[in-house]
Amino acid sequence: MQGLLKAIRGSQSTEQWRACGALILCALAFSLMTVCVKHLGGQLPVAEIVLVRSLISIVITLAMLQRVGVSPWGEQRGLLLVRGVLGTTALLCFFEALARLPLAAATLLQYTYPTLTALSAWLLLGEPIRRRIGIAVLLGWIGVMLVMQPDWIISTTGAVMPELPAIAVTLGLGGALLTALAYVSVRQLSAREHPLVIVFYFPLVSVPATLPLLWGQAIWPSPEQWLWLVGVGVFTQLGQIWLTEGLSALPAARATSINYVQVVFASL
């Protein structure tokens, strides 16, 4: 929450205030998406969840692009494809971590990405890491620890708990790094591309990327599972739209510090 407050205080224009609101809505949407994915964890292959999510996103995004009369292909197609690859791989890593780890552990690992985003934006885009943003990120980390209270760090007696699976932790951290790089690419693309075009390239890459992973493993979902899958698709789509809107108006480090509010939503 401290990251949220400091980011909002730094917003001077109406556009920036609107971007802050969009990012808060983004955090809420991604929290609801996480609940849906966690409910499906272990019941369906991760690649199948990503595939269905991507198909829903393509249908919705194409309809919205047609409505506003914008071509889906964009101008910076190379970077748009890179954004799609980064986002797809990050999503696969995060969903797999959710399936293998406790929710608190997976969330905590994922929320290393604001720090990684600030560093990546500084290295790749030359965006400065202002002191108040650095403080916001640090306070956000403390807030994550206090809110999630991961019991895998220390038990009530002070004894260190058994280690988490190394592969699952690697997937969680890898997903966070790829998420950070994807957000930096969105920030770069937003200067010239329509937000819906940026959103469109995510599922455009995800669909062909996940199909081979389902060879011989696909499971036809039950009616209840279809409801959760639709929830994943709709909430992720809303989150991506609001995320792109927020990153188009705010520096990457400030924008991602606002997303710490997702931890609050996740704890409710």
Located regions from the model:
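Hydrophobic/small/kink-forming positions within alpha-helical transmembrane segments
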Residues: 27-35, 62, 84, 88-92, ...
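Helix-helix packing/entry segments at the starts of transmembrane helices
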Residues: 52, 106-112, 189-205, 240-268
